[in-house]
Amino acid sequence: TMTVSDLLKAVIIGNANDAAAVLAEGVSGSVPAFVMEMNARAFDLGMHQTIFTNPQGYDDEKQCTTARDLAKLCQRLAKYETLQPYFQTWRDFLRGEATELVNENTFSRTYEGHIGFKASHTEQSGWCLAEGATRNGMTCIAVVLNGTEDQRFADVKQLLKAGFSQYRVMQPLFSDEFLKPLTVKGGVSTAVRFTADDVHGVVVPKAEPDLTAVLQLPSYIEAPVQKGRKIGSVAFYNGDTMLYETALVTTEPVEAMTFSR
């Protein structure tokens, strides 16, 4: 009997195709059903150039993807902290020490800040590597497809070096105008305070680190106002490139004025 943890070890560290099939059947009831869910999930992640036909990565004329799509998948995988120990393990064992697992991705033991993800090889796709690393609060992901056995590591290392040397994380700062309360009509208070629903660091070029916030707000809102109500949005730009957008929400309620008051 193998646990889910053992199966994940086998797949992530040892590239075990049989374990991938077992996990697929356990999650979806059958491999075909799992493949359908894989494709639906891939589409949700924005992997619009990807079609999966099996969970193992076997060569198939109908199966295809791109380096950009795989980078999107890795970006999502990086959010699952429970997977990090598997991605970061170079060598492990199953069934006591009966089965040895050795990670084909040598970055798992050699690259500073390594967080994942996968080294693989098939006849049609060649030697591939999807790698991610975090340094100084910034995560970079690089993907090389159809490379050679050794050159894929050199290429990915060069891509990551470029990412860490040319970009940095910047925290958005808001002007006094942003913090100015919004007018409320018909309420017990004449204004309401608001904030951005989701504010986090953004990656910008070190050479051009300018970051601007563009607000979309009405001139006023009508009472009553609930706490957490969406009243607009703010978009963060680096030059002409929008990095991300989030809602503006109220931080307090405002009751409507009544005749009794």
Residue ranges: model-predicted function:
Residues 47-51, 59-261:
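Domain-terminus/edge residues, biased toward the C-terminal soluble/receptor-binding domains
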